[in-house]
Amino acid sequence: MENKQCDHLTDWFSTTSDASESMDTTPPLPPPTPSVDPSYSGAAADEDLYSDISEGDLEYSDCDSASESDEDDDDCLIPSKEKAREVAASFGYTVIKTLTPGSEGRVMVATKDGQPEPVVLKIGQKGTTLIEAMMLRNVNHPSVIQMKDTLVSGAITCMVLPHYSSDLYTFLTKESRRIPIDQALIIEKQILEGLRYLHAQRIIHRDVKTENIFINSVDQVCIADFGAAQFPVVEPADLGLAGTVETNAPEVLARAKYNSKADIWSAGIVLFEMLAYPSTLFEDPPSTPEEYVKSCHSQLLKIISTLKINPEEFPRDPGSRLVRGYIEYSRLERNAYTRYPCFQRVNLHIDGEFLVHKMLAFNAAMRPSAEELLSYPMFAQL
């Protein structure tokens, strides 16, 4: 891709999004949409697919080789493996692989009698899984995972989801190299189109990360795993901790009020990881819930230190928890809204660096919306 934007880099880095925290005022979610039949890949599901677990790498176990310890449930909300298989069988599905359970249910790759294409079953207690199912039932966009069916057996809900060949994390790991800028922009555009749609429906995902981006090919990508999603959200609100520490926005880590702009930060991290692989901006994920809470503080300090956040880049509201708790850690060694010095070590493509810089604006009010980002020249050319 040509560097047509190079001449405007100075202006772009000095220009910020409208500081208002406005969001689209939209009608309620559209009526339920019919089931769709997207193209499937015959490859086995990767280990990070379709799971709600937010910290650490996930592993899947083959049905025939699962250890006895896998049968034990750490959470009463997760049906036993035998119960999940019984439910799947009662609906005519044959389980061909069991994935590591998520925080809200069992996840299995299965086929239905007479239908050779594999699907993924997410089986959990009605109260939790059904909420996610109801949300997915009412969304319809090619860049958002399409739920094929919702099945209920007593107190258990079974979501039927399309099977993708990989998630973006596994895709990057297998490629073991940076994704070329033209391909990365095609992927990022689809992610932003999905977020634009969700945000217009007043839904925020709250856990956008490479593990939750499913991919069959560069031009067939979707946002998945809505276990942490929140609806309806219009104005910034106290929504609590959710998602993954390493990709959470500063306002989420500080437990301040936030809205859809939190997803933009996370999508910026995804773009950085595509363009800078294997480099990451922020590492050391927590391994326990206790560490998760503690690491929110350390992660926020790491963001301020790594990006050398200037005090002028904090929210204007002095009562914000982000301001009250963290402005004292800000630095004056970098002028506000200028290039983050840490980008120099990874040598990002100029278009990619500009986008990441905009999406990682520390103050959510200065962060562009998905709609604004999609209007940028590098996406208009695709």
From Swiss-Prot:
The record's Pfam families line, in alphabetical order, gives:
Pkinase
Q: Where does ATP bind?
A: L99, T100, P101, G102, S103, E104, G105, R106, V107, K122
Reaction catalysis annotation = L-seryl-[protein] + ATP = O-phospho-L-seryl-[protein] + ADP + H(+); L-threonyl-[protein] + ATP = O-phospho-L-threonyl-[protein] + ADP + H(+)
Q: Which InterPro entries is this protein grouped with?
A: Kinase-like_dom_sf, NEK_Ser/Thr_kinase, Prot_kinase_dom, Ser/Thr_kinase_AS
Give the Basic and acidic residues compositional bias ranges.
Answer: 1-10
Q: Where is the Protein kinase domain?
A: 93-379
Annotated keywords: ATP-binding, Kinase, Nucleotide-binding, Serine/threonine-protein kinase, Transferase
Q: Do the record's keywords include Acyltransferase?
A: no
Q: Does the keyword Lipid biosynthesis apply?
A: no
Q: Which residues form the active site?
A: D207
Q: Where is the composition biased (Acidic residues)?
A: 45-75
GO MF term list: ATP binding; protein serine kinase activity; protein serine/threonine kinase activity
> What ranges does the record list as Polar residues composition bias?
12-24
State the EC number(s).
2.7.11.1
Renumbered residue ranges of the record's region Disordered: 1-75
Highest taxon above the source species: Viruses
Protein family (similarity comment)? Belongs to the protein kinase superfamily. Ser/Thr protein kinase family.
Name of the protein in question:
Serine/threonine-protein kinase
Provide the organism lineage as a comma list: Viruses, Duplodnaviria, Heunggongvirae, Peploviricota, Herviviricetes
